[in-house]
Regions:
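Acidic-glycine-rich active-site phosphate/pyrophosphate-binding loop
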Residues: 28-34, 189-197
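A short, basic/flexible loop-to-alpha-helix module at the beginning of a structural domain
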Residues: 199-207
């Protein structure tokens, strides 16, 4: 599900920024843009072998948006830009994965504390539900929580970590009356188990 919907549109925006930068600066890459995208991808557990699938959904979205303007020449040019950026991201993401205390992309975490703070916000604290080694986290990093949606599909939602004790992960979830995922997270109780992608540093707030 992370490869459909808003994900291709968000990535398309980053690729446009990347393309503009390399046109203006032919001998360098936009490190800040690449870092931001790489950390988001790593927080979702995206791996090198998934980039062709990302390409498929991305270019389907581009073709739908451009219509007849998506000529073979334009598609070829943007494909080249995609793989220039993609290969740079793959290198960065490999470094992020190598810095972790484990080699898994996600593991089970249980809710150990739940506090309602008003204004439809609940603060959830998680601890590992198994013995998977954890890298120490800090407030402000990315985290992705994976829960089953009402239709049975599993979906990931990114949040920014709050400060917490060692081996804990804490997030604040604001209820969106029109959003399915926030209502599911609001219904979690102490003892419930979810899957969590391993934490990566962030460089900007998660929207």
């Amino acid at each position: 599900s992370q490869l459909e919907g808003t994900q291709p549109r968000a990535l398309a925006g980053s690729i446009a920024v990347f393309a503009s930068y390399i046109v203006e600066h032919p001998n360098s890459y936009p490190d800040e843009v690449l870092s931001r995208v790489a950390h988001k991808h790593a927080s979702l557990g995206l791996k090198e072998e998934e980039y062709p699938t990302v390409y498929k959904y991305l270019f389907e979205a581009i073709a739908a948006n451009l219509g007849d303007l998506a000529t073979p020449e334009i598609v070829e040019a943007w494909t080249e830009v995609y793989w220039l950026m993609g290969n740079a991201l793959i290198k960065l993401e490999k470094g992020l994965y190598a810095s972790q205390a484990n080699d898994v992309t996600r593991a089970p975490f249980k809710v150990v504390d739940r506090k309602e703070t008003g204004e439809n916000v609940v603060v959830l604290t998680f601890e590992p539900a198994d013995d998977t080694p954890m890298t120490e986290s800090k407030g402000g990093q990315y985290i992705s929580i994976v829960v089953p949606a009402r239709d049975g599909l599993r979906q990931a939602r990114q949040y920014t970590l709050l400060p917490s004790e060692k081996n804990q992960r804490r997030i604040a979830v604001k209820l969106d009356p029109n959003g399915e995922m926030t209502s599911i997270l609001h219904e979690l109780k102490v003892g419930d188990v979810v899957e969590k992608h391993f934490t990566r540093d962030r460089v900007e707030d998660v929207k």
